[in-house]
Design a protein with these regions (language model features):
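Compact, aliphatic and Gly/Pro-tolerant "microcore" segments centered on a short helix or tight beta-hairpin
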Residues: 127-195
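M16 family metallopeptidases and their MPP-like homologs
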Residues: 16-18, 23-44, 61-117, 153-179, ...
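Short, flexible, solvent-exposed loop/turn segments with mixed acidic/basic and small polar residues
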Residues: 80-83, 189-198, 303-307, 401-405
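His/Glu-rich zincin catalytic helix
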Residues: 1-71, 103, 177-180, 186, ...
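Short, low-order "capping/linker" segments at domain edges
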Residues: 142-147, 244-258, 356-367, 373
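Acidic/histidine-enriched alpha-helical segments
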Residues: 65, 121-146, 231-241, 333-362
Length: 423
C-alpha cells in the first residue's frame, strides 16, 4: 500500500490518494466539515438523502439507483458523523476498477460524473430541492428519528449527551429535532448546501488499485467552477468539567433498565484514553465484561466509548431492574482498579493487541483505509498502523493509572424499566 502526500485541488480542498494493488475496486470519499446548531442539524441529515437519491440528470426516484446498477453495481452513499461540536458530511462512491469490468468497458469517468452531478447539480428547480423528492427524504428522516425514540438504548445515550453537553452543539441529536425537521423547507436545504459548497473545508480520499491521474483531475475540474471561501473549523471542543456530577432518573416501559455514565477530563493524551477504554470494554478480558457482566451478572451488556474531541468517556449498559445501584458501584470499581493498578498485568497488552488487530483489519478494504485516513485528520490517530502501534506500546501502566485518576464524574442517567418487554 502506498499513500501519497496530500495535495490541494482547490481552495480548502485537500486530496489524499492511496494505491493498493490487492484491491479490485475503487473508492472516492468526500468529507465536508461543517459547524452545527439546532437549525442546521436536521438539514445536514436531510442532505445525506437529498443528494444521493436523485440529481438533475437522474431526477426520477429510482433512476439514479438504476444507473448505478448498470455500472456493475457501483454504489453512492452518504452519512453524517458528529465530530466534537461539528459535523462531517460524508459522501462515498465505490465501483469496480476499469481493468476488471467483464466487457472491458471503463466506468471510472462515468461514476465520477454521477458523483459530481449529485453534489454540484442536484435535483432542484427555482432555488429549491424538488418538492416530491424532499417529501420522501423528510419522511425518511422522521421515521429514523421515531426509530431512535423506540430504541431505548439510543434514546438513553441521546438523553445523556443532552445533559452532559448542555448548551454545546454536541448536545444536539445527530438527526436534529423532530419539530425542526417538520419546519425545514426545500429552499432552506438548498441554500445551506450551496453555502457548504462554498465555505466548508473539503477532504477527499481516493483509494485505488492502481495509479489513475484522471481521478484527481476530474475532481479538480468539477470543483473549479465554485467560488470557494473556506472557513476554518475547530474539531477539538473539550466540554467543561462539572464541579458536582448530575444524576437523572426516570421510568420507562421497558423490561430492562438503561444506564449511561459519563466522565470528562481536562488533559490526558488521546491514545491513553483510547487504550483505557479498550481495557474496560472491547475484548474478552475487558474489565466491564469480565467483572460487571459475567462475574456479578449485573447487566445484559456493558460497553465503553471515548469521545476524544469532547474529552468524554461514556459507559452504557442494560441493567437488570432493581440492580441499578449495584451496577453503578461495580462500574466505578473497575475505574478504581485501573486507578490503583489493581488490574491484571495482561489486560493492557491484550487491549493493545486488540487495537492493533482492528488497525490491520482496516487495511483489508478500501472503505477501511479511507476511514482510517479520515480519522487521522479528525482525531489525530496515525494512519500508519506501525506508528500507531509504537505509540500505544509506549503507554505505561502508570500512564493508565494516572489517566483513570484524572477522569471526573459528570453525568449519570438511569432509565428504570417498569416491566413491559418492549426494550
Amino acid at each position: 500500500m502506498l499513500m501519497r502526500p496530500p495535495v490541494t485541488l482547490g481552495s480548502g480542498i485537500r486530496y489524499t490518494e492511496v494505491l493498493d494493488p490487492k484491491l479490485h475496486g475503487c473508492l472516492v470519499s468526500l468529507h465536508f466539515a461543517v459547524p452545527r446548531d439546532a437549525e442546521s442539524a436536521p438539514v445536514h441529515a436531510l442532505l445525506t438523502d437529498l443528494l444521493t437519491a436523485a440529481s438533475a440528470a437522474y431526477p426520477g426516484l429510482g433512476a439514479l439507483s438504476a444507473r448505478l446498477d448498470a455500472l456493475y453495481a457501483a454504489d453512492l452513499s452518504a452519512s453524517l458523523t458528529l465530530c466534537g461540536d461539528c459535523t462531517d458530511l460524508h459522501f462515498s462512491a465505490s465501483w469496480l476498477d476499469d481493468a476488471l469490468t467483464p466487457d472491458g468497458r471503463p466506468i471510472t469517468a462515468q461514476v465520477l460524473a454521477l458523483v459530481l452531478g449529485c453534489l454540484l447539480r442536484p435535483h432542484a428547480q427555482n432555488g429549491a430541492f424538488n418538492e416530491a423528492l424532499f417529501a420522501v427524504c423528510r419522511q425518511n428522516l422522521l421515521d429514523e428519528i421515531d426509530g431512535i425514540l423506540g430504541n431505548k438504548r439510543e434514546y438513553a445515550l441521546q438523553l445523556a449527551a443532552e445533559t452532559a453537553f448542555s448548551g454545546e452543539p454536541a448536545a444536539i441529536p445527530p438527526q436534529g429535532d423532530r419539530g425542526r425537521v417538520l419546519c425545514a423547507s426545500p429552499a432552506a436545504c438548498l441554500t445551506l448546501w450551496q453555502e457548504i459548497l462554498h465555505t466548508a473545508p473539503i477532504g477527499i480520499i481516493a483509494v485505488l488499485p492502481r495509479e489513475n491521474p484522471a481521478v484527481a483531475e476530474t475532481l479538480r475540474q468539477g470543483f473549479a467552477g465554485i467560488s470557494r471561501r473556506p472557513r476554518p473549523v475547530t474539531w477539538r471542543a473539550p466540554s467543561p468539567c462539572r464541579a458536582v456530577p448530575v444524576r437523572i432518573d426516570d421510568e420507562i416501559p421497558i423490561s430492562q433498565s438503561k444506564l449511561v455514565m459519563i466522565w470528562k477530563y481536562r488533559d490526558i493524551p488521546r491514545r491513553t484514553v483510547d487504550l483505557l477504554t479498550k481495557m474496560l470494554s472491547g475484548t474478552g478480558t475487558a474489565l466491564l465484561f469480565v467483572n460487571v457482566r459475567e462475574r456479578e451478572g449485573l447487566c445484559y451488556d456493558c460497553s465503553a466509548t471515548h469521545s476524544p474531541l469532547k474529552h468524554a468517556l461514556v459507559i452504557e449498559c442494560g441493567v437488570h431492574p432493581g440492580r441499578e445501584e449495584d451496577a453503578i458501584a461495580a462500574i466505578g470499581a473497575q475505574l478504581e482498579a485501573l486507578r490503583t493498578g489493581a488490574h491484571p498485568d495482561s489486560l493492557q497488552g491484550e487491549a493493545v493487541l486488540g487495537m492493533e488487530y482492528a488497525a490491520a483489519c482496516a487495511l483489508d478494504s478500501a472503505s477501511g483505509i479511507a476511514n482510517r485516513i479520515a480519522a487521522a485528520a479528525y482525531f489525530g490517530v496515525s494512519p500508519d498502523p506501525a506508528a500507531d502501534s509504537a505509540e500505544l506500546r509506549r503507554i505505561s501502566r502508570d500512564d493508565i493509572m494516572r489517566a483513570a485518576g484524572a477522569l471526573i464524574p459528570d453525568t449519570v442517567l438511569v432509565l428504570h424499566g417498569c416491566g413491559e418487554p418492549n426494550a
